[in-house]
């Protein structure tokens, strides 16, 4: 369970949105690849992602990832429409498999970074759990890789702001990904008339200097225009 703290500002800045990309290798389902190391032993592996048992409405019900001819990850009796998969390799040489199988409303049986350990792919960063308790339809993707750090964009239909996307930075330390900060930066917030981070205050809104503060710093008056910049995840 997380509590969200919103940081707001008053500067008006207009810019065109830029789609972020990460330094990864894209894999497609039902193809075999032999040019990449996914196990972390420094040698190239044979990897295949198989989507099978397609139903009348074109959804699949089975997902299998095999490495060197052996099953490393499997989902059965499930439902998804396609597979998005990428290999990301950190500066330290550790490879990870991003696997997302979306279904209705973007939800699906898996949206996670997987690490190959003892013959199996296991979740090391589950994008559906990062903001658990704050909203629905939680998914994410890696949008930048630099050294042993990744930037992820977490998309969610939140209880307070509706559809939005937030960037968080994680670093791989001692065998796991840990956030470098409790703060995330809003990439997009979708309002009724499109994407925006500017909102009109409907009623006087008290604000605080930090997430754990108890004393009100200032009050935003009804009708004032404000921009939401960041949020904090507090466990």
Language-model segment annotations:
Residues 2-12:
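Bacterial N-terminal signal peptides
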Residues 27-29, 75-80:
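Surface loop/turn motifs at the tips and blade-to-blade linkers of beta-strand repeat domains
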Residues 36-44, 89-94:
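Residues in Ca2+-coordinating acidic/glycine-rich loops
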Residues 45-49, 98:
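Structural core positions within WD40/WD-like beta-propeller blades
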Residues 71-77, 125:
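A short beta-strand motif characteristic of beta-propeller blades
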Residues 189-234:
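Beta-loop motif signature
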């Amino acid at each position: 369970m997380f509590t969200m703290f919103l940081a707001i500002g008053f500067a008006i800045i207009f810019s065109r949105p830029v789609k972020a990309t990460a330094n990864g290798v894209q894999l497609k389902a039902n193809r075999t690849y032999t040019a990449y190391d996914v196990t972390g032993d420094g040698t190239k592996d044979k990897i295949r992602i198989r989507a099978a048992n397609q139903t009348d409405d074109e959804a699949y019900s089975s997902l299998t990832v095999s490495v060197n001819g052996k099953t490393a990850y499997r989902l059965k009796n499930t439902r998804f429409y396609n597979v998005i998969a990428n290999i990301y390799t950190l500066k330290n040489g550790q490879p990870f498999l991003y696997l997302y199988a979306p279904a209705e409303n973007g939800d699906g049986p898996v949206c996670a970074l997987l690490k190959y350990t003892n013959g199996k792919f296991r979740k090391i960063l589950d994008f559906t759990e990062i903001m658990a308790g704050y909203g629905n339809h939680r998914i994410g993707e890696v949008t930048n890789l630099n050294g042993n750090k990744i930037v992820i964009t977490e998309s969610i239909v939140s209880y307070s702001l509706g559809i939005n996307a937030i960037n968080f930075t994680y670093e791989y330390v001692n065998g796991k990904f840990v956030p470098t900060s409790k703060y995330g930066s809003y990439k997009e917030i979708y309002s009724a008339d499109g994407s925006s981070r500017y909102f009109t205050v409907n009623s006087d809104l008290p604000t605080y200097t930090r997430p754990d503060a108890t004393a009100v710093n200032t009050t935003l008056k009804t009708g004032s225009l404000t921009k939401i910049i960041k949020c904090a995840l507090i466990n």
